Amino acid sequence: MIIATLAQKSAMASQYSDYGVSVTWWCVDEERTEAAASMNAVLRKAILDDETVNPVGDINTVITEEMLAKVTEINITTSMDATGLTLDGLDLCTNLTKLSINAWQVSLGDIDLSAFTKLTDVTMSPTAGYTSIQLPDGIKSFKSIIKYANHEPVGPTTLDLTQYTDLEYVSVMDSYGEPAALKSLNVSGLSKLALLYVGGTPEVNIANCPLLTTCIKNN
């Protein structure tokens, strides 16, 4: 990649073409239209820090439609400053296939991911929990790990995953030794579920899961 001005690109591009050399140009003075102004600041930073989406890093602070189309994964880790995290603007990432939220001392409310038709892998683990969650119909992997770390989680208190018939893997851990916020987990009737990890939840319904040969429950 060559970072240059439009004038420099105009003057030099033909030289590379003449020698059959493929070059990606980033023109610092090229006008770019912001397409994610309404997006939560934490999500924006995660996208701008993704080199596959924004290869020039801090040089660019604009998220364009073209960049949004390239976003297939968003990963918020506990090492990041996730203060003020919401999922506002996440719907702009229409090609999202994987979402991982591991945010320290963050709680989220009612989460609705049902419109994300390409999303198959979700980790929803803000350490202070979330109220409820709706997943996409095509979800295959779901992880939810809620930790007590000098704060009380807001939930969830129940998880009924029975409508998500493509689920193959579920990992739900809660509390790490404290009384669990999650009181019940229902995965009954999931014909594709093959692996289940559960921790801290007193009631788990695994009836009629024909492929489920491994269910690891830690109290």
Placement of each model-derived feature along the sequence:
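N-terminal capping/linker segments that flank leucine-rich repeat
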Residues: 1-105, 110-146, 154, 160-169, ...
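Intrinsically disordered, low-complexity Ser/Thr- and acidic-rich flexible linkers and loops
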Residues: 148-153, 175-179
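Tandem repeat scaffolds
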Residues: 177, 195-196
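Active-site lining segments of carbohydrate-active enzymes
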Residues: 199
